[in-house]
Amino acid sequence: MLKQNPPYREWGLILMKFLASIDVMPIKEILDPQGKAVLLGLKNLDIQGFGDCRIGKHINMEIEAADKATAESIVEDACKKLLANLIMEEYTFELTAI
Amino acid sequence: MKFGVVVFPGSNCEDDTVFAFRHNLGQEIVKLWHKDHDLQGCDFVILPGGFSYGDYLRSGAIARFSPIMNEVIAHANKGGYVMGICNGFQILAEAGLVPGALLRNIERKYICSNIYLKPQSSSTLLTAGLEDRAYKIPIAHGDGRYFADEDTLKQINDNDQVLFRYCDESGVICPEANHNGSIENIAGVTNAGKNVFGMMPHPERASDEALGNIDGRFILEQVIQVLA
């Protein structure tokens, strides 16, 4: 189960709202055929200068928590358990207060 | 011996699986709804092909958290038999019940065609009794490129956990026969306990004479011959 955000509202606490900006990318050991196809397309368009190209996912999610550290630990948990498959992907994220 | 096939939203091979086991193999088989928490006394659970939850996020990633998966995982951990075919294999991999992961096919295309498989493991229920020849079985998937890191790969090879490898018509395991770009031509694997089987090809779609190919039936029959 994912970690539950404690029932702060019921306790009368004011929650902070964040935007979690999450990137999920294929790990470097894995060949990324999508990235290769995009490079080929750019070459066909005669747009020059690009090197290695890797394609992943970007996920934006709003999250409410008591503070930034709590929000971070919840997003971390979500990434590990569902948003990324750590056998083939890695993730990074940033939190911005909104 | 009672078989059960789990139906997830977006599964589309559950009827083929029921037909193969009931009509071609004469077995008792029931459908299990993914929201239930009851395996209805099934000894052998099958996760069928399809596109559970529309393949959103990653193939099998959401289905892996369907309510019935708690019971399926508990069944597998107790040594009970579980088999995942195509999307079912992806769900098993996401659940960590079999090693490795399934990536987008190397040529990025969805492949629907007959391919050939060479049985590998001599120590699993599913493959030990098969002949040493190429079996013609259909595949239909976009995310079938098997991947495992170096350590895992060594472990599954050393422990005889590879069920099938893609081969050509004469049984030669070669790069040309590796349609989806799987590591070491791997088409199916089992867990360390050898009671959970995952494979991308569809044996249930090659089980009836009317379809002109019963190589799949020979594979599914293994389970019955040993357990019945």
What are these regions (language model features)?
Chain A
Residues 3-15:
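Short, Lys/Arg-enriched N-terminal segments with co-localized hydrophobic residues
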